[in-house]
C-alpha cells in the first residue's frame, strides 16, 4: 500500500457536532475506498495566510493513511463537493508502507514524548540541581576584544606569492 498525507482546512464556524460529522466522513471515506487510517491529527483553529471564502481563520486537520489512487481520488472528490472544507492537499509519502508498523512506530514515539515530558516536568520541581545562571553580554561591545595580529596578513601574502608563481 502507498502512504499518503492529506491536510485539509475546515470552516472554523462549524459547530462541534458538524465538525465531528465532517471528520467522521473523512475517516469513513478512507475505509470505504480500501484504505487504512494510520493517524488522525487535529491541529485546531489557526489564522490563515490569506482569506479563503472571506474567512481569516481555518480549522486544520491532518490525515495520515495508506491506500491506493482510488482512496485518494474518493477523498478528494468528497472534499471538492463539501462546502465545509475550505482547502485540502494530499501528498504521497512512500511506496510500500505497512499500516500496522506505522501505527506502532507512532505509538512508541508518543510514549517516548510523554516520558520525556514527564521527566521534564519532574526536573524543575527539584530546583537545587541547576547551575547558577550568569547573564550573557548585552552586545558585542561588552565582549572582550582580541588583539589583531599580523600573522593573518603574512598568510595572505604567502598565498598570493604562490598564486603568482603558478601563473608564471
From Swiss-Prot:
One of its GO terms (biological process) is translation. Binds together with bS18 to 16S ribosomal RNA. Residues 103-168 are annotated as: Disordered. The keyword Endoplasmic reticulum does not apply. The lineage of its organism: Bacteria, Pseudomonadati, Thermodesulfobacteriota, Desulfobacteria, Desulfobacterales. InterPro entries: Ribosomal_bS6, Ribosomal_bS6_CS, Ribosomal_bS6_sf, Ribosomal_S6_plastid/chlpt, Transl_elong_EF1B/ribsomal_bS6. Belongs to the bacterial ribosomal protein bS6 family. GO terms for cellular component: cytoplasm; ribonucleoprotein complex; ribosome. Signal peptide: none annotated. It comes from Desulfosudis oleivorans (strain DSM 6200 / JCM 39069 / Hxd3). SUPFAM superfamilies: Ribosomal protein S6. NCBIfam families: S6. Keywords: Ribonucleoprotein, Ribosomal protein, RNA-binding, rRNA-binding. One of its GO terms (molecular function) is structural constituent of ribosome. Residues 116-125 have a biased composition (Low complexity). Pfam families: Ribosomal_S6. Residues 106-115 have a biased composition (Basic and acidic residues). The keyword Transport does not apply. This is Small ribosomal subunit protein bS6.
